[in-house]
């Protein structure tokens, strides 16, 4: 919203604006003439497909419900939201195709905008964590909260911020990994911290 006045002024002056990456949700109509970005919803779907391949057997073997954490740094950025929703909707689609019930809980934006109808006693719970402020500390705490839930089998991070927070949140708990009794960690983007975490097995990918 802070940019909207400037965008309107640029439009009125005939200055074309091209956005990159996240886009500008709520921008004055016609002020942003194009946006160069990943199809973030499709990217989230692809992440879900690859993740579900790894989780499928664990879900089948679980006697009770299983929880898949979804970490987003915010509920306002177009790229973050769509990567999260793409992941949520595709996991739900795949799980439902295998005969499981699915629900979404946590952040209201994701619960309301996902294609999943909330239901009680679901086999697969998609638990969305978004911090009140975008800080590494709060996101690491979100990760720890998810890791400390007994039914969590996976956590997905929708960008580098969330991925690095997963690594930090795991430091004392040491629950992330690819073993049957560990929590699978998958994330978007890369950087030194995430690359090293994939290399040493903390993150699956």
Give names to the regions the model predicted.
Residues 1-205:
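A residue-level marker of the well-folded mature domains of exported/periplasmic proteins
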């Amino acid at each position: 919203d802070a940019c909207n006045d400037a965008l309107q002024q640029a439009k009125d002056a005939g200055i074309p604006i091209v956005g990159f990456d996240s886009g500008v949700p709520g921008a004055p109509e016609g002020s942003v003439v194009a946006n160069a970005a990943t199809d973030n919803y499709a990217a989230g779907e692809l992440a879900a497909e690859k993740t579900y391949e790894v989780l499928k057997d664990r879900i089948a073997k679980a006697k009770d419900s299983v929880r898949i954490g979804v970490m987003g740094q915010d509920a306002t950025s177009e790229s973050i939201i769509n990567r999260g929703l793409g992941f949520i909707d595709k996991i739900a689609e795949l799980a439902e195709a295998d005969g499981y019930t699915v629900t979404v809980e946590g952040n209201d934006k994701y619960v309301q905008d996902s294609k999943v109808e909330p239901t009680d006693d679901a086999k697969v719970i998609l638990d969305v964590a978004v911090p009140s402020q975008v800080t590494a500390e709060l996101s690491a705490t979100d990760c720890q909260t998810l890791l400390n839930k007994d039914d969590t089998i996976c956590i997905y991070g929708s960008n580098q911020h969330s991925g690095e927070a997963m690594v930090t949140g795991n430091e004392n708990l040491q629950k992330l990994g690819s073993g049957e009794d560990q929590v699978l960690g998958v994330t978007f983007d890369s950087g030194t911290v995430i690359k090293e975490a994939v290399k040493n097995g903390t993150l699956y990918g």
